[in-house]
């Protein structure tokens, strides 16, 4: 099945997309030597609701990534409809590119990964790639207990991403600048959108 295409899938709510997401994309492309990184905003997340509508989040992602080589922003999950489960996205792009994709998640996802829909299938049908966030050790220990052998998981050697979309929304709500938190292409629009 493997065509040799090195494809990464970077899903998330991107509510909003921030400089940490851009950093993860740059390092992922470089470290994994990807042919393509597909950024997939969630349409209908199973565990939390988004603040910004899909169209707005998709538009921001397009603006931020339009000049970045090898990056594609996909609206697959909107087109699919229903609840946005990662396994369906992985299976879809596996079939399109005839390869086992890399699936990129934040380190904090390891603390509840076993709660993801068909998480064993995710581990089987993709190579899990984890980028660092905050302190990783407790997450790794939890993942080891629940998932067992972590040797198949790729842990990216890159700066720790300490920015969160939740923090950004709160900063905007109380009128603080988002300079340095979100890319300049969308900063003013994001400040207004989430502002009080």
From Swiss-Prot:
The keyword ATP-binding applies. It comes from Thermotoga sp. (strain RQ2). Its EC number is 2.7.7.18. CDD domains: NMNAT (cd02165). Transmembrane segments: none annotated. It is an enzyme of class 2 (transferase). This is Probable nicotinate-nucleotide adenylyltransferase. Belongs to the NadD family. It catalyses: nicotinate beta-D-ribonucleotide + ATP + H(+) = deamido-NAD(+) + diphosphate. InterPro entries: Cyt_trans-like, NadD/NMNAT, Rossmann-like_a/b/a_fold. Pathway: Cofactor biosynthesis; NAD(+) biosynthesis; deamido-NAD(+) from nicotinate D-ribonucleotide: step 1/1. SUPFAM superfamilies: Nucleotidylyl transferase. It comes from the Bacteria. Catalyzes the reversible adenylation of nicotinate mononucleotide (NaMN) to nicotinic acid adenine dinucleotide (NaAD). Keywords: ATP-binding, NAD, Nucleotide-binding, Nucleotidyltransferase, Pyridine nucleotide biosynthesis, Transferase. One of its GO terms (biological process) is NAD biosynthetic process. One of its GO terms (molecular function) is ATP binding.
């Amino acid at each position: 099945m493997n065509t040799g295409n090195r494809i990464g899938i970077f899903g998330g709510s991107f509510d909003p997309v921030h400089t940490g997401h851009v950093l993860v994309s740059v390092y992922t492309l470089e470290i994994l030597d990807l042919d393509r990184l597909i950024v997939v905003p969630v349409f209908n997340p199973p565990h939390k609701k988004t603040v910004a509508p899909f169209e707005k989040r998709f538009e921001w992602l397009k603006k931020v990534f339009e000049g970045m080589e090898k990056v594609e922003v996909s609206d697959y999950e909107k087109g699919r409809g229903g609840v946005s489960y990662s396994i369906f996205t992985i299976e879809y792009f596996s079939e399109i590119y005839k390869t086992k994709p890399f699936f990129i998640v934040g380190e904090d996802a390891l603390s509840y990964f076993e709660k993801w829909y068909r998480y064993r299938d995710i581990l089987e049908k993709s190579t899990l790639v984890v980028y660092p966030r905050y302190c990783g050790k407790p997450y790794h220990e939890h993942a080891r207990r629940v998932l067992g052998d972590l040797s198949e998981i790729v842990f990216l050697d890159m700066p720790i991403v300490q920015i969160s979309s939740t923090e950004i929304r709160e900063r905007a709500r109380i009128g603080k600048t988002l300079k340095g938190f979100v890319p300049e292409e969308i900063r003013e629009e994001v400040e207004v959108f989430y502002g009080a």
